[in-house]
UniProtKB/Swiss-Prot annotation:
Record keyword Ribosomal protein present: yes
Any one of the GO CC terms: small ribosomal subunit
Organism of this sequence: Borrelia garinii subsp. bavariensis (strain ATCC BAA-2496 / DSM 23469 / PBi) (Borreliella bavariensis)
Keyword Nucleotidyltransferase in record: no
Keywords from the UniProt entry: Ribonucleoprotein, Ribosomal protein, RNA-binding, rRNA-binding
Gene Ontology annotations of biological process type: translation
Membership in a protein family: Belongs to the bacterial ribosomal protein bS20 family.
InterPro entries: Ribosomal_bS20 (IPR002583), Ribosomal_bS20_sf (IPR036510)
Pfam families: Ribosomal_S20p
Function (record text): Binds directly to 16S ribosomal RNA.
GO function terms (MF aspect): small ribosomal subunit rRNA binding; structural constituent of ribosome
Protein name: Small ribosomal subunit protein bS20
Length: 85
């Protein structure tokens, strides 16, 4: 890697972004699992309310380009299918 100032700055920025993105992705996985567990436990009313929260988080992550918009749409669709069963 070059030792000029701009390369060092980009390296610092990339590291900060990676840390932030990893934490958001981890949070998304956790809340998605919680929603699935609610559905499997038969708590549909709670799951429906929680699904709205999950969808909002997925849309936010897609808007900030942490995940791809199609991935967010796919995850919301699959959770919705589970809810409707």
């Amino acid at each position: 890697m070059r030792k000029n100032a701009s390369a060092l700055k980009r390296s610092r920025q990339n590291l900060k972004r990676k840390i932030r993105n990893v934490s958001v992705e981890s949070e998304l996985k956790t809340i998605e699992k919680r929603c699935i567990n609610m559905i499997k436990a038969g708590r549909k009313d709670e799951a429906i309310e929680f699904f709205k929260f999950v969808a909002k988080k997925l849309d936010t992550a897609a808007r900030k380009r942490i995940i791809h918009k199609n991935k967010a749409a796919r995850k919301k669709s699959r959770l919705n299918i589970l809810l409707l069963k």
